[in-house]
Amino acid sequence: MANTTGRIPLWLIGTVVGTPVISLVGIFSYGSYSGLGSSL
């Protein structure tokens, strides 16, 4: 595997991008489960 991302490792990009996405999905899922998103 060639490092084509320059000085930024791919796992770091995945962590930075993935963490807020997982948090957002978790909050939405919890909201739907607790009844806040039942109107959707």
Curated annotation (Swiss-Prot):
Pfam families: PsbJ (PF01788). It is a single-pass membrane protein. InterPro entries: PSII_PsbJ (IPR002682), PSII_PsbJ_sf (IPR037267). Coiled coil: none annotated. It is found in: Plastid, Chloroplast thylakoid membrane. The chain crosses the membrane at residues 8-28. Keywords: Chloroplast, Membrane, Photosynthesis, Photosystem II, Plastid, Reaction center, Thylakoid, Transmembrane, Transmembrane helix. GO terms for biological process: photosynthesis. The keyword Transmembrane helix applies. Disulfide bonds: none annotated. GO terms for cellular component: chloroplast thylakoid membrane; photosystem II reaction center. PSII is composed of 1 copy each of membrane proteins PsbA, PsbB, PsbC, PsbD, PsbE, PsbF, PsbH, PsbI, PsbJ, PsbK, PsbL, PsbM, PsbT, PsbX, PsbY, PsbZ, Psb30/Ycf12, at least 3 peripheral proteins of the oxygen-evolving complex and a large number of cofactors. It forms dimeric complexes. PANTHER family: PHOTOSYSTEM II REACTION CENTER PROTEIN J. HAMAP family: PSII_PsbJ (MF_01305). Belongs to the PsbJ family. One of the components of the core complex of photosystem II (PSII). PSII is a light-driven water:plastoquinone oxidoreductase that uses light energy to abstract electrons from H(2)O, generating O(2) and a proton gradient subsequently used for ATP formation. It consists of a core antenna complex that captures photons, and an electron transfer chain that converts photonic excitation into a charge separation. This is Photosystem II reaction center protein J. It comes from Huperzia lucidula (Shining clubmoss). The lineage of its organism: Eukaryota, Viridiplantae, Streptophyta, Embryophyta, Tracheophyta.
